[in-house]
Amino acid sequence: MRNKPILCVDFDGVIHSYTSGWQGATIIPDPPTPGALKWLWKATGWFDVQIYSSRLKDPLGRDAMLEYMIKHSRVEFGDGHPMTVSRDFPITFAHEKPAAFLMINDRAICFDGDWSELDPCDILAVTKESPDAPISYPVTEIPE
């Protein structure tokens, strides 16, 4: 049997809506982003779905994330579904960034191989839109 390709999915801002910002590795207060759980369940048919998050640096972060996923999956799918049972949970939590076929992340830029098209100032402008980005960037002069 051929192994499925790894699909690495970020947690905060992608699965967890993250509207309250960072509260700690074990505090996950916001609902899932609309459609996330159904999409992830469907993706398990084609991919080895692995969730990667900075929350996993805390030993209790994985448990909090699994609890969150199961709790919200019960609402989405009802009891008895594989997404609602800890021992059958079809998605893994990667303690380090996996060698993924593809990644889904709300804070990433798709690199096309041309560094000349990737302007650091443009990146700063985009990240300034983020609610937990620093207030100001002391960029006064761009090095050539």
Give residue ranges: language-model regions.
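Catalytic phosphate/metal-binding cores of nucleic-acid and nucleotide-processing enzymes, i.e., regions
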Residues: 1-144
